[in-house]
Amino acid sequence: MSRIGILSERIKGRREEIESRGQTFYQGPSQINLASFPPKERWDDWVELDSKAWPNRVEHHSMLVPTTCFNCESACGLLAYVDRETLTVRKFEGNPEHPGSRGRNCAKGPATLNQITDPDRILYPLKRVGPRGSGRFERVSWEEASNDIASRIRQAITEERQNEIMIHLGRPGEDGYTERVLAAWGVDGHNSHTNVCSSGGRAGYHYWSGIDRPSADFANAKVIYLISSHLETGHYFNPHAQRITEARERGAKLIVVDTRLSNTATHADLWLSPWPGSEAAMNLAFCNYLIQNGMYNEEFVRTWWNWQEYMAALHPGEDPTFENFQNRLKEEYARYTFEFAAKETGVSEAVLRETAELIATAGTAFSSHNWRSAAAGNLGGWQVSRSIFMINALLGAVATEGGTHLNAWNKYVPKPIYTPPHPKVWNELSWPIEFPLAMNELSFMLPHLMDHTGRRLEVYFTRVYNPVWTNPDGFSWIEMFLDPKKVGCYVALTPTWNETAFFADYVLPMGHSSERHDTHSYEQYDGQWLGFRQPVIRAAKERLGEKVADTRAVNPGEVWEENEFYIDLSWRIDPDGSLGIRQYFESKANPGEMLTVEEYYSWMFNNSVPGLKEAAKAEGLDPMQYMRRYGAFEVSKKIGTVYAQPVPEDELEDIQVSPTGRVFTRAPKPASPNVVPTGDPAPDDEGRRPVGVMAGDQILRGFPTPSGRLEFYSSTLATWGWKEYAIPTYIESHVHQSKLASGEMPLISTFRLPVQIHTRSANSKWLDEIAHTNPLWINPIDANRMGVKDGNLLRVNTDLGYFVVKAWVTEGIRPGVVACSHHMGRWKINDDFGSRAMMRTVTLKQDGSRWNLDPSKGVEPYKSSDPDTSRIWWTDVGVHQNLTFGVHPDPVSGMHCWHQVVRVTKAEAGDRHGEVFVDTAKSKEVFRRWMEMARPAYQVSPDSTRRPRWLLRPLKPTAAAFALPDRG
C-alpha cells in the first residue's frame, strides 16, 4: 500500500467520526480523508489547541462567521474565527460553503487580519485643518461631518446643480447599492474606475453580444486561451485558477498570450509573447485559419450571427444567401495570414500555425478570456476582446459546456427593497459628448474635462479609490484638488490612508471585508451564486443574543460602513421628505422610521432570491439567518444556452418580425427578481419590445443586441461614425513599431502581482513583506546595449517627464520592450498620517506647471501596537510611475490606453530611486492630442442623441436626458 493509502487508512476514522455525528465533512485537497474545514454544525463553538502552549493543552473556542473578501473583484468566501471570550478575530480562512471559491483563498484573503489590526488605519472621522494638501487633520464627530456634507448636497439639489455631486468608485465590491443611492438623490453622479481598468475589454464583448463580460467555463474546456495572467491575478483569479487547474488535470491545453513571462505563462502548453498591441492581429489570423479551411461551426454561424444585416449593409447588390456571406467572410479576413501576424507580433509563423491547429481541435469546448491586459494597454485594444470572442463565435463555443458564456447569465443581482427612478439629468464631466460610444465614464480625465467644460463639483466623494495614485497624470488631479473653485468639498470614504486622501476635506473611515455589509455575485462558472459580506463581530454578537443597531458599535474606533452611512446621510439631505429622497430610505415595516441594513437585506433575501427560503427553512432558519450563517447561496448550479431557449407563449402578443428575423411583442416584460444589467435594444416603430429571434420555425430568446443575434456586423459602430470598425478588425496600437522613433520602446505598466491589492495593501504586513518594489523589467539584449546591470538606476522618460527606477535584467520580457508593475511607489506627505510599512515620505515641489516628487525619508522599522512593525527589514518600496503618464482616451471605448512610449536612459547625477518629475503643461498637450481622435456626438449621432441608448450605462438617465443639447 502506498504512503498516501496507509495515511488514509490511519485517519479514516476521523471522517467516519464526523459523519457518524451527522456533521458535514469537507474533503481536503489531499483526497485522503483529511478535512479542510470544521463541520458547519460546529461553527458556533469550534475548539482548537494553542500550538504555542504545547505540551500544555490550552483550548481556543471560536465562532466561525462567514464574510466575503474585499481584496480583489473575485469576492471569495472567508470564515472569520471569532474568539468567544474576547470577541476579536483570530484569523481568516476560506469558506467551504461559497460556490465560487469553494473554501480556497489566495494570500490576500487571510491578510484581511492585517488590515483590521493595522496600527496605522483610520479609526475616526477627520476634517482638514489648514490648506488643502497640507496633510493636517483633526478628529471630528460623524454628526458634524455628515451635517456639513448633507447641507452642501441639499443646497446643490435645490438649486438644480445636481451635476455638481459625484461619487467616484474604485473597487465596487457590491452590486448596485451606490447606484440606487444616487438615483434616489436624482443625480447622474456615478463615476467609476472602469475606464482605467476594463472598458476596452468590455467594449469588444458588448458589441458582439449586448453583454460586456465573458464567463468562461474553464473547468470543462478542452482548450483554454488566455490573453491574461489568470493563474496569478485578475478577474477572477482564485475561482478561475482552480478550475483551469482542474481542466488541465483532465487533459485540457492552455495557451497564454503575454509579452511578459508571467507565472501563468510558465504553466502554458503554448506561450506566445507578441509585440504589445498586436494581439488582435494574432486572433484574426486564428480566425482566418478557421474560415479559410472551413473549420468553423457553420450551423451556429448561420443561426446566430447577424450575417444578413452585414450583407444588406455592405453588399446590398448581392443575393443575401449564407453561401455568399461565407465567400465574403473569406475575402474580409484573407489578409490576416500567419505571415502578416508574424510580422506584426514577432511570433513565428510555425508557432502561430501550431496554436491555430490546437484551437481548431477544441470544437465547442473552447474557453477564452481577456479583460485588461492588451485590451487595457492599447489604442484600439477593444478589438482584442472583440477578436478573441470571434474565435468562440466561429467555433460555436458560446454558452456551451467548456465554452465561453456571458456574465449576465452567470450573475445574480437580487432586486432590492426600493428601486428609485433614474435621473433626468446628464453629467458631461463623466460622459462627455466627444465620446458617445464610451463604455464607461471618462473618469481618469476629470481634471481635464473640468478645464475643457468650465464645470465644477460641489461635493466629490471617492469610495475606496485613489485617483492621484491610480490614474494617469496624478499631478493634474492634485492641481484640481488644490483649486477650491473646481472642488467645493472633497470627501474620502476609505478604510486606509492613500495619496489622494491627503488632499481631502473629510477623511471618513469605512470598514474592511469583515466590517461592512454588501451583496455581490460574479461569473465564475456556468451557474449563479450570491455572496453576502457582513460585519463579523456584529453577526457573532447576534448569535449570542445581542441586538446591534449600528455597525459602528462593533467596529474598531468609529469605523462605519457605506450602507448605513448613505442611509443616514440621505435622511440629513431630506429630513422632512420634501425632496422625495427620504422615501427610499424609510422602513417598510415601520413607516416613518429609518431603514436599517437588517431590513434592507432581509427583504432582499425573502423576496428576490429563488430557492433561498426553502433552503433556509430546511435548516430551521429564515433567509437572513441563513445568509448570516453561511455567507453565500447557490441560486443555480447550471444555466446553459440562454440564447437558445424558446420564448414562452405568454410573452408573444401581437408580434412583428423584422426582415432579419428580430421578433417584437406587445406583451410586457415579465418581472424578474434578478436585475442584472444587459443591453437594452430599442422597441420597434410601434412600441413593441424586442423579445427574441426567428430560428427556423421557432422563436428563441437570442441576445440583448439590436439584431437579437451575435453582431459580427455592428450597426451601432457603423451609424455612430466608425464604419471602418463595423466588423472585427485590427487597429495599430499607439505603440506600434512603425510609430516609434529611434531609441523609443513601449512600457507595459498594467500587470499586477499576486499578493498586492491595487493601492489597498500598504496596510497588510504579510503581503508587503512578500512584494514591496517594482523594478523595470529589461531584456539582457537591451541592457547590454545600454551598459546596464541589475540594480542600476534608470530614468524612464515619458511625454510628461520621467521617473527613476532600478533595473531588473531578465529574459522574461521580450527585447525592445520594458515593463514595470502596478501597486508600488506609495508615498505620504508627512509622518503624521499614512501606512508607514509601505509609504515613503516625500516632498512635493511645484514651480508653475513643473512638479517634483522627491523622496525624503524611506520606510524603516517603527514601534506600534503591532510588534512586527519593529521588524520591518525592507526599505525599497518602488516608484510611482503613473504620475508621468499622460491621458490616452481610446476614441471609441473611452478606455485609457496604458502603454507608454518611453526612452530609457541611465540615471543622471543626483537622481534618486523613486524620484518623479512631471510638467502638467505637457499633460494638457497630450490631452488635446488624443482628443483630436474623438468623433463627438454632434458630428456622428444619427438621431440627435448623446449615445446609443441600448448600450449598458451605469445609472442610465431617462430618455429625455439622452437628447443632444443645443450647441449654443
Please name every model-derived segment.
Residues 805-809:
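Short beta-strand-centered aromatic/proline hotspots
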Residues 1-296, 348, 461-463, 507, ...:
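N-terminal export/assembly segments and adjacent metallocofactor-ligating motifs
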